[in-house]
Each structure stands twice: as structure tokens, then as C-alpha cells.
């Protein structure tokens, strides 16, 4: 049988403990709703917090990987654009050489064709030398290969440079013709240069496709990591909202229970009146 005492009100103590517990839960739920996270710090759940932090760091590092791969794409795109121009120039050079191989031409016409040929040749040098992105080129012979970031561990994606200069295509800065016979020979030389150029551009195209594919993969991997971190630490706001309402009701009842328990001491005093 419970004793009635004015020194120790066990009912009030129990009611106060329950109310404090409810208030603590309520504070936690409100914090989750305010931050949107169920794990906001290591004290909430050390193991999950550490895992989430590591995965989040990996996901964030993927931004550097994506930036590097995108630079790679742009570098190749510039080289491909220069290559398109160069193959067009080679085609026009072949046309001039073919026309100049006509032995029925007069000297003025032949010289005009030769001048056009030489001008087109010099434009190849300009196109190759200007094929740079952010000061870097894989078309002008300044580098043998470029390696871009492929993953957060620092591994790389290597692109082999394809020199599209005159030398890289089997020509020289003095490649020309002075006779119809030499012009005829030059046709074969230009055909070889064209084949070399298209082979190199095809290889760059394959590298570009590889970069595109890997960049897409990195984006999906980053999204998966972000989603995984969210699953670990994000709060279920619908669930927390329902819990908030329940705890608020429980808090109100706890306050009433504490008030009732505290009134028992007054009831004991009334017995002595």
C-alpha cells in the first residue's frame, strides 16, 4: 500500500521523469525537422555518421573528376574541330594539285593554282597551332599524351595526342610543286596525308566517346553516393511530423499528470484542518 508523505512525493517524481523524457524526445524530433537530418552529428550515431561523412567526401571529390573529364572533352573537341578544318584544307589542296597536273595549262594559270596550294598548306599550320583549349593541345605536337582524372582515388584516363601539323601528316612547310608532273605526284602525297589525318581523327573520336561514357558513369556514381548518404542521415519528415504531434499531446498530458501529482500534498494538508 502506497504511503502518503509530504516529504517525498513519488507520484510527482515519476510524472516529472516522464515529462522530462517526453521533452527530450520532443527536442530531438524538432531538431530533426529543423535540420532535415536524423543523424546530425557523431553523438547521434557515431558509426553511421562516420560512414556518411566518408561517402559524402567521396561524392564531393567526384566534382574534381568531372571537371577534369570535361576539360578532356573540350580539349579533344578543339582538336577534332581543327582536324575537320585540316581535312577540308587537304581536300582543297588535292583539288589544286589535280588541276595543276593538267599539262594544257598556261603558265599564269599554273602559277595561280600553285599559289593557292601553298596558301592552303600554310593554313594547315595555323589550324594545328591554334588547336588549344586552356593552353593545352593534343594536335600541335607539343605533347605525347594527356591524363585526366578518372576516379576519386586519383586514377587517370589517358588520351594519346594526335599530331595534325604538316609534319604529323607527312608534309613539310615547303611541300609544293613546280611542274605539272610534280603536281601529279603531289596528289598521291595529299591522299596519304588525308588518310593519316582521318585515321588520327577517328582515334580521337574514340577517345572522346570513352570520355563521354566515363563522365556519364561518374555522374551516376556521384548521384548514387549522394542518395546513399541521404538514406543514412536524412530524416523522414512525414514520420517525424506525426511523431511531433504525438509527443506534443504526450507533453500536455505529462504536464497535467505532474500537476495532479503535486496536488496530492495539498490534499494531505487538508486532512489536518
Swiss-Prot record:
* Entry's Gene Ontology molecular function annotations: structural molecule activity
Spell out the InterPro entries in the cross-references: Flagellin, Flagellin_C, Flagellin_N
What are the subcellular locations of this protein? Secreted; Bacterial flagellum
Entry keyword set = Bacterial flagellum, Secreted
Predominant location category = secreted
Q: Which GO terms describe its cellular component?
A: bacterial-type flagellum; extracellular region
Organism domain of life: Bacteria
Q: Which Gene3D superfamilies match?
A: f41 fragment of flagellin, N-terminal domain
The family note in this entry says: Belongs to the bacterial flagellin family.
Q: How does it assemble?
A: In C.crescentus, the flagellar filament is composed of multiple flagellins of 29 kDa; 27 kDa and 25 kDa.
Function, in words: Flagellin is the subunit protein which polymerizes to form the filaments of bacterial flagella.
- What protein name applies here? Flagellin FljN
Amino acid at each position: 500500500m502506497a504511503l502518503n508523505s509530504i516529504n517525498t512525493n513519488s507520484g510527482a517524481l515519476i510524472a516529472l521523469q516522464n515529462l522530462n523524457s517526453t521533452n527530450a524526445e520532443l527536442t530531438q524530433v524538432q531538431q530533426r525537422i529543423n535540420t532535415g537530418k536524423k543523424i546530425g552529428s557523431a553523438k547521434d550515431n557515431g558509426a553511421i555518421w562516420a560512414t556518411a561523412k566518408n561517402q559524402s567526401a567521396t561524392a564531393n571529390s567526384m566534382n574534381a573528376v568531372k571537371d577534369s573529364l570535361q576539360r578532356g572533352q573540350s580539349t579533344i573537341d578543339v582538336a577534332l574541330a581543327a582536324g575537320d578544318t585540316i581535312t577540308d584544307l587537304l581536300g582543297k589542296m588535292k583539288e589544286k594539285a589535280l588541276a595543276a597536273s593538267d599539262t594544257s595549262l598556261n603558265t599564269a594559270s599554273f602559277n595561280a593554282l600553285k599559289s593557292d596550294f601553298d596558301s592552303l598548306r600554310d593554313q594547315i599550320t595555323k589550324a594545328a597551332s591554334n588547336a588549344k583549349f586552356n593552353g593545352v593541345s593534343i594536335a600541335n605536337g607539343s605533347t605525347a599524351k594527356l591524363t585526366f582524372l578518372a576516379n576519386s582515388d586519383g586514377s587517370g584516363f589517358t588520351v594519346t595526342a594526335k599530331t595534325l601539323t604538316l609534319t604529323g601528316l607527312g608534309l613539310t612547310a615547303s611541300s609544293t610543286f613546280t611542274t605539272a608532273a610534280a603536281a601529279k605526284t603531289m596528289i598521291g602525297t595529299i591522299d596519304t596525308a588525308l588518310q593519316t589525318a582521318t585515321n588520327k581523327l577517328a582515334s580521337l573520336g574514340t577517345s572522346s566517346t570513352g570520355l563521354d561514357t566515363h563522365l556519364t558513369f561518374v555522374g551516376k556514381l556521384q548521384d548514387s553516393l549522394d542518395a546513399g548518404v541521404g538514406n543514412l542521415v536524412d530524416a523522414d519528415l512525414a514520420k517525424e511530423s506525426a511523431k511531433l504531434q504525438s509527443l506534443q499531446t504526450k507533453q500536455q498530458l505529462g504536464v497535467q499528470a505532474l500537476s495532479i501529482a503535486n496536488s496530492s500534498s495539498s490534499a494531505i494538508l487538508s486532512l489536518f484542518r
